[in-house]
Amino acid sequence: YVSSANQYSATEDYPYYYNGNFEPYRGRTVHKYLTEKDTVDVAYMKMMQNSTFSMLAKEALAVMLHLLDSNNAIHAHAKGLKRWDFHYDANSLNPVRFDKWFTAFHQMLWDEIYTQQDQVALPNPDVWVTVNFIEKNPYSKFYDIKSTVKIETLSDLINQSFRQISDDTISPLAEEKNAQILHLTRLDAFSKLDINVGGTKHSLNAMQQKFGPSWRMIVALGDTPE
């Protein structure tokens, strides 16, 4: 099969400069679904295109949940995330739990970058860079928060960021997202608001608050294409 899902356009040895924003998780999710089957039909392709599975959440939580201390591990947020199937379903609390925790952790890990952005044009490290970093670098000087006396570790940041969101009230994903299809005039009366829908920018059903798939198409080849 041949697939494309906004992933990187070339390998690391490509000799020329190019730029753009690339999505590292949707392409891998397509490969996941297609390699699980020897043959696929239209129904399977429909299911795949509507999938809310997040490979980002699966890979990040494999590290983050493992390093939670005993007190945090028994919190309702942690228990919910341990049972989660990593799908961003509309009525689920766990996608919101994960997003809040990962955002807090990302800001805590790269705090020196965030605090310098008013003076220097520094981009935020991509989420895949962050996940790859914590998978391969359990010990690094980047985990230390320079503004504190203590020398923090990866475990410290994961537990501190979890405690930071542990008292947050968690709403179902659709309520938290408040998905909207806005009219060109941006007038609410002409728009569709408060859509009860799942998905995330890193899943194949990449529905966000105001952006998402506008149409889907499946073509079945054969003697009578449809």
What are these regions (language model features)?
Residues 1-74, 79, 83-226:
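C-terminal/peripheral segments of proteins
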